[in-house]
From Swiss-Prot:
Protein name per Swiss-Prot or TrEMBL: Glucose-6-phosphate 1-dehydrogenase
Gene Ontology biological process terms in this record: glucose metabolic process; pentose-phosphate shunt, oxidative branch
Enzyme type, top EC level: oxidoreductase
Reaction(s) this enzyme catalyzes, per UniProt: D-glucose 6-phosphate + NADP(+) = 6-phospho-D-glucono-1,5-lactone + NADPH + H(+)
MF terms (GO), sorted A to Z: glucose-6-phosphate dehydrogenase activity; NADP binding
GO cellular component annotations of the record: cytosol
Positions with a binding annotation for substrate: 130, 134, 168, 187, 288
Gene encoding the protein: zwf
EC number per UniProt: 1.1.1.49
Residues annotated as binding NADP(+): 100
Taxonomic classification: Bacteria, Pseudomonadati, Chlamydiota, Chlamydiia, Chlamydiales
Source species of the chain: Chlamydia trachomatis serovar D (strain ATCC VR-885 / DSM 19411 / UW-3/Cx)
Function description: Catalyzes the oxidation of glucose 6-phosphate to 6-phosphogluconolactone.
């Protein structure tokens, strides 16, 4: 375990004294999820450790398990009194972390929530989305609401469109069984990309607290218009070359149906029906086996309307759209592109870029997303965790599209591993006179 910590830690080295104090408090207990007796033994073992080390009975249960076991584990933890239902300032606490997926559609999400409601208090549930633990994602609200430069033009009057892109060069690896039940829309879009969209578009909360932020995100989710089938593209990679390595197509991967209709790429065009965003298209894309690993948000502003820079007055001034790029991974940071005069006697205008990177500006190591989120859970801070209302509102948006897709068998594969995306995804934007930004 020490070697693993050394390998994955962002810190340059581990303080051996700190590690030894932690190592002596790590214990392993094995049981079967379905074995009722195992939970009784676990309860007795935890109580023994409480007495031995004076840990006062605090419990954090992290269900990093196959989602099929969530409800069974939750019921058994409650049945064997491993959850506390009366938690005050001077009393021990019990908390539950659940990994996505939170259901596979609206119906199953409601079933999971019914199980949660019957067994543990909602305030003790932490639905983890590791994207919300990334430093740049947390910075979105600060960029927006702490800077008049951006918030004053953060609306349909000045913004042409927005692109949110998640590109992964990897395939599904050994996750074939899981991915066959999920697909890219459930695995990435319904949660990660939707959370980014909410933070990018929500109204300012009355206070910078967990519940107020969640209220504004839910309002946005409920204002997203139903997704039209013609505004959604799905794809699946075939064999190809990624970073000079030949790779299999999705249907040839381990534990994948050779005739699978599961999507490994999704592109969507969404609209938000409120005064701030009316008419602004939001383009979302996420895919596997693309050329490189990157996640970013691009806010594309409208071109200047001043006649000073039209073709007649300034033929050498082909203005580009101003851009705000929020890089989530790799190289977390923010870049601003704007038009500037080229030095010299001619009236030449070219786009230039100002680029901020966390690792070069701040003399500190950015913690891993999970590191921040686990710490918040221990402290009882739910700000960066997803609420049940957000989960259900998101499924209300995407479940109808998934149902439509299930009724029509797609022609797959429709993009090569290592290529940019399916042709249909390019056409989704070209119909609007736009194009995807480079990864």
């Amino acid at each position: 375990m020490k070697l693993a910590v050394q390998h994955f830690s962002h810190s340059s080295e581990i303080d051996i004294r700190v590690w030894e104090s932690l190592e002596n408090r790590i214990f392993y207990h094995q049981a079967n999820f379905s074995d009722a007796e195992g939970y009784s033994v676990l309860k007795a073992y935890l109580e023994q450790l409480d007495q031995q080390y004076g840990t006062q009975g605090n419990r954090l249960f992290y269900l990093s398990t196959p989602p099929d076991y969530f409800q069974e584990i939750i019921r058994n933890l409650n049945r064997h009194q491993l959850f506390y239902h009366e938690q005050g300032a001077q009393q021990p606490w019990s908390r539950l972390i659940i990994e996505k997926p939170f259901g596979v559609n609206l119906e199953t999400a409601r079933e999971l929530q019914q199980c949660i409601d019957a067994n543990i208090d909602e305030e003790s549930v932490y639905r983890i989305d590791h994207y919300l633990g990334k430093e740049t994602v947390q910075n979105i609200l600060t960029i927006r609401f702490a800077n008049t430069l951006f918030e004053s033009c953060w609306n349909s009057q000045y913004i042409d469109h927005v692109q949110i892109s998640v590109s992964e060069s990897i395939g599904i690896g050994s996750r074939g069984n899981f991915f066959e039940k999920s697909g890219m829309l459930r695995d990435m879009v319904q949660n990660h990309l939707t959370q980014l969209l909410c933070l990018l578009t929500m109204e300012p909360p009355s206070e910078f607290f967990s519940e107020e932020i969640k209220k504004e995100k839910i309002k946005i989710l409920k204002k997203i218009l139903p997704i039209r089938e013609e505004d959604a593209v799905r794809g699946q990679y075939g064999e190809g070359i990624v970073q000079d390595v030949s790779v299999l197509g999705y249907r040839e991967e381990e534990n994948v149906d050779p005739n699978s209709s599961v999507e490994t790429y999704v592109a969507l065009k969404l609209f938000i029906d409120n005064p701030r965003w009316k008419g602004v298209p939001f383009y979302l894309q996420a895919g596997k086996r693309l050329p490189k690993r990157t996640t970013d948000i691009a806010v594309i502003f409208k071109k200047s309307s001043y006649n000073l820079f039209n073709a007649e007055n300034c033929p050498l001034c082909p203005l580009e759209n101003d851009l705000l790029i929020i890089r989530i991974q790799p190289d977390e940071g923010v870049a601003l592109q704007f038009n500037c005069k080229v030095p010299g006697t001619n009236k030449l205008v070219r786009p230039v870029k100002m680029d901020f990177r966390y690792d070069s500006y701040f003399n500190t190591v950015t913690p891993e997303a999970y590191e921040r989120l686990l710490c918040d859970c221990i402290l009882g801070d739910r700000t960066l965790f997803t609420s049940n209302e957000e989960v259900l509102a998101s499924w209300e948006l995407f479940s109808p599209l998934l149902e439509k897709w299930s009724q029509v068998r797609p022609i797959f594969p429709n993009y090569m591993a290592g290529s940019l995306r399916p042709q249909e995804a390019d056409e989704l934007l070209s119909r609007d006179g736009k194009a995807w930004r480079p990864y």
